[in-house]
Structures are given as C-alpha cells and as structure tokens.
Amino acid sequence: MVSRTLSLSMSLFRAHLVFYRCALNLNSSYNFGFLVAMTFVLQIITGITLAFRYTSEASCAFASVQHLVREVAAGWEFRMLHATTASFVFLCILIHMTRGLYNWSYSYLTTAWMSGLVLYLLTIATAFLGYVLPWGQMSFWGATVITNLLSPIPYLVPWLLGGYYVSDVTLKRFFVLHFILPFIGCIIIVLHIFYLHLNGSSNPAGIDTALKVAFYPHMLMTDAKCLSYLIGLIFLQAAFGLMELSHPDNSIPVNRFVTPLHIVPEWYFLAYYAVLKVIPSKTGGLLVFMSSLINLGLLSEIRALNTRMLIRQQFMTRNVVSGWVIIWVYSMIFLIIIGSAIPQATYILYGRLATILYLTTGLVLCLY
C-alpha cells in the first residue's frame, strides 16, 4: 500500500514537474505563479513558528507579540519575514494576474482563472485576519472601520465579530481562521496547477505553438533563478527595512478611547479600502467593491462564449486589450495612493474618478 501510494505520488510529480510540456517562448513574467506558491509555503512555515508564542487573548496579544520580538531568540526575524512575505505574496499575485490579463490567459483557461481568483479572495481574507492579530492601535481601529464598512453583509460580519464590536472573541476567531485559511489556499493552488496543466499554459504570442520543451530543466531553472532573487529581496527588506511596511501606531497598545488621526491599512488593502471609503453609502461602497471583484470573474465567463471569441478574432487587435489592461493597472495604483491619503474632499473626488475608471476598464475588458 505504501509503495503504491509512493509510486502514484512520484508519477504525478514526474507528470507535472518533469515531463510537462510548456512553450519555449515563455518569459520571466510566467515565473510569478511559481513564486506565489513558494511565498505561500514560506508564510505557512513562519506563521506556524510565530503561533507557538502568540496568545490570542485581548489582554495579552500585544504583550505576546512584543515578547516575541524583543526576548525570543530569532523572534523578530520570523515576525519581519512573515510580515514582509505577506507583501510579496500580494505583489506576486497581482503581477501574475496582470500578466494573465495582458496575454488573454483568461479567455481559454477559464477554470484556471476562476480558481486563481478564488485564491486571490482567500488571500485577501487571510491577510485581513492576520492584520488584526498584533492588536495594536492601527490593527484594532482598522478592523473596526473595515468591519463597519462591510456590515451590510448579513450574518457574516456579526458572526466574525462575535458581538457588536471588535473584542476578545473577535481576536480568537480571527486567529483560528487565519491559521486555517492558508492550508485551504494550498489546496486551491494545487487545483489551479491541475487546471492549468489540464488545458496547457498560454504563451506571450497568444497562439498555439509546436515549439515546446519539458518543464525540467528549462522552466524549473528559470523558476529557481527568480526564486533566488525573490528570497534575496525578502531577506533584505526583513533585515534592513524592518517596520517600513507597517504603521507606527501599530506599536502602541490598543486604546478604545483614542482613535488614530488616520486609519491606514496595509498597502495591499488600500485599493479596495479607497473604494469603500470614497462612497458615502456603506451599502453602495460594498456593492462597488463586490462589482470590482465580480468583473474579474466575468472576464473568463464572457470570453469563453464562442460569439465573443469570434468577435475578438474579427474586429480586435492585441494592442487594444493591452492598452486597456495598462489603464486598469494605473487606475489600481491610483486607488492605492488615494487609499493612503487623508479623506479630504479633493482625494474623495479623485478616488471616485479612479473607481469609475477601474470599473469601466474591467467592463471594457469583459466586452472585448
């Protein structure tokens, strides 16, 4: 039984990581999918290590984090690695998604695109849950503001809070979910790879080509080279950047009676935080936020229709879609800047314009 299981595992390993055929003209942008998987593994390793010392009790959570950083051997390295790798997870996912948009991967890799979108949503949820765990001022008030903005969702937010406000029960639930969700994410990554290899990966030319090589050693070596660069960047940021990616207010214990001057979540939340912030109605902001995510899902579903594929082949050029993707990227960067700004009238106006541009580009990509 053991030998049969081992033989099956090795056959799957050889099929997907040795003999799998991929196009010869793949460039470095195709390595970010592999980097996403590796950053997930690094996050799980550092997260489990940190969980040994963390206390999910409202009265002790902040003190346990400070004890971990100041007194535990190599504690600050693991915390900085965990926080820094979280940023690189989102950076790799966003670059991977942008490459998929730019090269039309969503039009004929529908199941792979949808599984990747589910992974993106799961990563956002996991990061938000982990953002609250240090139990500093910015974590507490950021969780309070964001859960308040998401409160129109029935049942979900009250169940997560465990009451009427962010409390000790909320912290315990966030810790448990933050521990479990990355393992679910690993399952989705495996499904994503399965769906990708089931249909075959795309290539920059956007056409089927007979020039294919085995995954090993060609692609595996390029993946290893990019992974070495990524690990170097992560360790440089973790060792020398330290708390640059965090907010100073998060080093202050929670005070329910003092609100920070400006609520600023992590940079990878800022685009969607800006969408929620610039819409005066909570329900309206939530609908726009959900629409921005649904747009990404509709891309693969609409483009899978034969009629849309025929229209694309007859009346559209590659440069049109590439141009709209570039506008989509710029609108998201602009939303990130607006999300980090103080909510004044000028920034709110620019944020609404950027939100309209972001949604419009998504709809245009769906129609094309």
UniProtKB/Swiss-Prot annotation:
**Residues at which heme b b562 binds:** 82, 178
The record ties this protein, via CDD domains, to: Cytochrome_b_N
InterPro entries in the record: Cyt_b/b6_C, Cyt_b/b6_C_sf, Cyt_b/b6_N, Cytb/b6-like_sf, Cytochrome_b_N_euk/bac, Di-haem_cyt_TM
Indicate which residues the UniProt annotation says bind heme b b566.
96, 192
Claim: Ubl conjugation is one of the keywords in the record: no
Question: Alphabetically, which GO biological process terms does the record hold?
Answer: mitochondrial electron transport, ubiquinol to cytochrome c
Listed GO MF terms: metal ion binding; ubiquinol-cytochrome-c reductase activity
Q: Which residues form the signal peptide?
A: none
The family note in this entry says: Belongs to the cytochrome b family.
Fetch the PANTHER family from UniProt: CYTOCHROME B (PTHR19271:SF16)
Further remark? Heme 1 (or BL or b562) is low-potential and absorbs at about 562 nm, and heme 2 (or BH or b566) is high-potential and absorbs at about 566 nm.
Protein name in the entry = Cytochrome b
Please spell out the taxonomic lineage of the organism that makes this protein. Eukaryota, Sar, Alveolata, Apicomplexa, Conoidasida
Q: Which gene encodes it?
A: MT-CYB
